Amino acid sequence: MAIFSVYVVNKAGGLIYQLDSYAPRAEAEKTFSYPLDLLLKLHDERVLVAFGQRDGIRVGHAVLAINGVDVNGKYTADGKEVLEYLGNPANYPVSIRFGRPRLTSNEKLMLASMFHSLFAIGSQLSPEQGSSGIEMLETDTFKLHCFQTLTGIKFVVLADPRQAGIDSLLRKIYEIYSDFALKNPFYSLEMPIRCELFDQNLKLALEVAEKAGTFGPGS
C-alpha cells in the first residue's frame, strides 16, 4: 500500500501545498564505459534519453542519478553539469540511474490549475444541482481522491488503488490544515502553506495510513 502525493489547491485553482511521499521507482541502472552508447539531450531543463533504448532504458527516461548522486534538472546534487560530466572520458566507468522524469514545480502548478478546471466542468455537467464535483478518478496504477471544503479548498491525494480509508485520510488532512495552518497567525488564506507543524503532522498522518492500510475514525 502507498500514498504517492498530496496536493492542496485554493479556490482560485492555485497550488498552495504539495508533498511527494514516495521515491519514484527507478526503471533501470547500468554502468557504462566510454563512449556512452545512448544519445542524451536537454529538454525542459532535464536530461532525457533521445535514442538508444536498451536493457530497460527507454526513450524519454530521465537521468535520475550518476554514481549514486541524485540529479536535479541538468545538474547533479553536488553541482556538476550532467552532459558535461558524461562527455568527459576521465569520468568513466560511470553508473547512471534512469527513470520517468520527475515533475517540475511549474508542471505541478499547471496540473493543479487543470484539475481545478476539470472539477468545475464536472460540477457543471452534473444533471443534478449541488454536485460535489470530482471525488475520485481511477487509473490502472493509482487513484486520485479529492475532498473540497465549503470554502472551496481542495485536498487531493494520489494513492495506490488498493489503499483503503482515503476518505477518512482526506478529512484528517483538512483537520491538520485547520489546526496548524489556519490557526497559525503568520499564515494568510489562499497563500502557499509553509508551516513546519503542518508538515510534521501531515507526514505522520500519511505514515499511519500507509502502515495500517486504512485510516479509520480515532486514528
Swiss-Prot record:
Pfam families: Sybindin. Keywords: Cell membrane, Endoplasmic reticulum, ER-Golgi transport, Golgi apparatus, Membrane, Postsynaptic cell membrane, Synapse, Transport. It is found in: Postsynaptic cell membrane; Golgi apparatus membrane; Endoplasmic reticulum; Vesicle. GO terms for biological process: autophagy; dendrite development; endoplasmic reticulum to Golgi vesicle-mediated transport. InterPro entries: Longin-like_dom_sf, TRAPPC. One of its GO terms (cellular component) is Golgi stack. The keyword Endoplasmic reticulum applies. It comes from the Eukaryota. Its main location: membrane. Gene3D superfamilies: 3.30.450.70. Core component of the TRAPP complexes which has a function of guanine nucleotide exchange factor activity for Rab1 GTPase. Plays a role in vesicular transport from endoplasmic reticulum to Golgi and autophagy. May play a role in dendrite postsynaptic membrane trafficking. Component of the multisubunit TRAPP (transport protein particle) complex, which includes at least TRAPPC2, TRAPPC2L, TRAPPC3, TRAPPC3L, TRAPPC4, TRAPPC5, TRAPPC8, TRAPPC9, TRAPPC10, TRAPPC11 and TRAPPC12. Interacts with SDC2. Belongs to the TRAPP small subunits family. TRAPPC4 subfamily. This is Trafficking protein particle complex subunit 4.
